[in-house]
A protein has these predicted regions:
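Conserved alpha/beta-domain cores
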Residues: 1-131, 135-137
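C-terminal helical cap(s) of enzyme catalytic domains, especially alpha/beta-barrels
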Residues: 135-155
Length: 155
């Protein structure tokens, strides 16, 4: 399964292709995933993306929006929430991301009480520069593309 940030207008193409969508951050996106997954007779696994750090440059719902969207997602028969995703800001010292990862882990652990036992399994947080701290704080999915492929080249 590949992680992607999903725009509403791309749901139609993404749902048949992806096992797990990592970037669900709104009711609007949930509604579109539900509609397309229904047409494909599929239950689409998703991670709810929370912008714990409140960074304007990052997507994701606010911590305050999280309970409402989490509860709404639970009502959709063709959407299955599997966990949480968050991205910390880039810090020169990865330790500075630790408080953000702790909040995300607390939300993740709390989620487990709202869904069927065993349904919430994934905490996706941490990237090449801070994945070790993320793992220490409970991540079980990390994004380390830069470590594998090198820096992105923009043309």
């Amino acid at each position: 399964a590949l992680p992607i940030y999903l725009q509403v207008n791309k749901v139609r193409q993404a749902v048949p292709m992806f096992d797990l969508i990592h970037s669900v951050d709104s009711r609007k996106l949930l509604d579109e995933i539900e509609k397309v997954a229904t047409k494909h007779d599929k239950v689409q696994d998703v991670l709810l993306q929370v912008n714990v750090a409140r960074e304007a440059s990052k997507t994701g719902m606010s911590v305050e929006e999280f309970p409402d969207i989490r509860d709404y997602a639970k009502t959709l028969p063709h959407v299955r929430v599997r966990g949480l995703m968050c991205m910390a800001p880039f810090f020169d010292d990865p330790e500075e991301a630790r408080p953000i990862f702790r909040v995300a882990n607390a939300l993740y652990e709390d989620m487990k009480g709202y869904f069927e036992e065993g349904q919430i399994q994934y905490l996706s947080m941490g990237m090449t520069h801070d994945f070790e701290v993320a793992l220490e704080e409970g991540a079980n999915i990390v994004r380390v593309g830069t470590a594998i492929f090198g820096e992105r080249v923009y043309y």
